[in-house]
Structure formats: structure tokens, C-alpha cells
Amino acid sequence: MTERVAILGCGYVGLELGRQMRADHDVVGVRRSDDGIAAIEDAGFEAVRADVTDPESLSAVPDADWLVFAASSGGRGAEAAREVYVEGLRTAIDHFWSRADPPERLVYTSSTGVYGDHDGAWVDEETPLDPQTGKTEVLAEAERVARERPAEHGGHGSAARFAGLYGPDRYRLDRYLEGPVTAGYLNMVHRADAAGAVRFLLAEGHREEVLLVVDDEPVEKWAFADWLAEQCEVSFPPKQTTEERLADDGLSETAKRRIQTSKRCSNDRLRELGYEFEYPTFRDGYRDAVREYRQN
């Protein structure tokens, strides 16, 4: 039997997931905007217009064996995030599991931001959460919904905690080449591996409640910026300590908490399950971006 996967909020990672799965699975991408629908169609799989906060519109989405909830709040504040990540997720779960042919499982795409600050120490799936902004508190709440709500209907839910996403259109070279670069750790995962890890969870039938999705090598921001400058054959960028950055009077409280957050995320569990990274470290993942920069 060919499984059908419905990707709710089929954006940056969802489009890549659909491209990876379309050869062996029936894939449906769900967005609410014209541009979103066009992007799904361009990626080569079925597009359906619906809104996760509107159960009536979700009726247009066909039955699916697997659900991936990757909707975005569009960079807005905590209340907008709650509407999508918590209420929208709850609405989608209740809608699909009320059908005569409900899904088997759900994967919700979360963020390593739920850990908060660990002063550069390692964190893994067993580390207690300590969200320090309104939005990351919402993400932690959404994880609980993703794990618990499907179980109430006899299904299974998982949360895939993505580290900082990068890849096509998101290399952000100027940020690190021009600086100033603030101290702290970077935890990253290439878009291909963020999508690949979700595909792996679904296709291999792994039923982890929570899984960290991050590459092999957390790196200090200063070291990464210097490596990138060296590869691009430009001068090393200016740097700031955390204290120097926090002295900026224009920072919001949310920005200050983000700057003070430092941790190293472990992918040991994902590796133990057998996932093979396409881009194990930033050195692999930034190769094409560096080549393009040097050619220009």
C-alpha cells in the first residue's frame, strides 16, 4: 500500500519533504495563500487550499495515513503563534481523527528554542524544557498537544525539534561576513536533513515522542564566521561579546533573552536510529553557497 502524507503548512521544509517523498508516496501539500499553492504545484505534488485554524476548510484535504504539521505563524508574536501552533494543531488533530479513516500518526515540527539557555552545555531529548520567550512557551505547549491529543484518539504523535534551519535562500552569508557577530553557539540543520529526518521517522516507522533534528557539530558563532570568511576569501568580521551586544539600548526583551541563550544540541538519538545525514556539518552544507559567493 502506498501511504498518503498530508503536509499542513507546506512551506520551507514541507516543500522539501514533499519533493523527497513524492516518488514513493502520495503527497498532499496544504497552504492557504495563492503563492503557497503555486509553490506546492511547482514542487510537483498535489496542492490543497485550507487553513489549519478552520476545520471546515480542512474538509478539502483528502484522508491521509500520516500528518505533518509544519504551519508557520509568519514571524508574528506569541498570541498569533498560539492561534496556529496550539489552536490550529488541536483543530487539525480533532478534525482528521474524527474521520472514518483517521491517520496513523502525526509529526509536529518544533524548535530547539524550547530548551532555553544552558550556558553552552549539551542538551538532548531528556533535558528538561525551559522556554524563555512567549513564542517558545507556545511551542512547548504545542509539543504537548502533538504528543497527547492523537493518543486520545488512538493515534500517535511526535515532535521533531529543529535546530536553526539553513539551505537555499537561507544561507544568510552577509550576517556572518559583515558582522558584528555575537558570541554563543550555533546549532544548525540543513533543510534537506530537516525534511529527511521527518521522512525517516515516517517511512521507517520510528515512534519517538520527541526527536532532536540537528547536525553533528554545534559551532561557536565566532569560529563559524571566521571559517566562512576564510572560505569566501574575505576579511574576518567584527565580533561582539554577549555583554557588548546586550548594551544596545534598542533591543527588545525577547531579543535580549535570545542573545543570552546558548546551548549545544546533540543528535545522538537520531544517529542511533540510523538516520544518515546528507550534510553532516556546516562545512558540507555551506559548500554550494561558498562556491556561488566566490563566483560572483
Q: What are the language-model segments listed below?
A:
Residues 91-133:
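Conserved Rossmann-fold NAD(P)-dependent oxidoreductase catalytic core, especially the SDR/UDP-sugar
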Residues 119-159:
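Catalytic helix-loop patch of NAD(P)-dependent Rossmann-fold dehydrogenases
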Residues 137-140, 167-177, 200-211, 217, ...:
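Glycine/proline-rich active-site loop of Rossmann-fold NAD(P)-dependent oxidoreductases
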Residues 197, 204-258, 266:
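Mid/C-terminal beta-alpha module of Rossmann-like enzyme folds, strongest
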